[in-house]
Amino acid sequence: MRSMFDQQLKTLNEEMLYMGGLCEDTIQQTIEALMSGDVKKAHALNNMMSQLTQQERSIENICLKLLMQ
């Protein structure tokens, strides 16, 4: 059981790192869209924000599973 818990913690860590990368990309793209005034690029950020929201939910689910054990 302990090894399963450790594996879930490892998965949580990997998901958090992935989300951190998504945040970095989103911030960079936002800055570029603002600096260039590129409306298309700004609209494309909605997709990135959706990915972040989905990743957040995934992380929340992992955390809930860990807490319920």
Region spans (language model):
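Cytosolic, long alpha-helical scaffolding segments
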Residues: 1-69
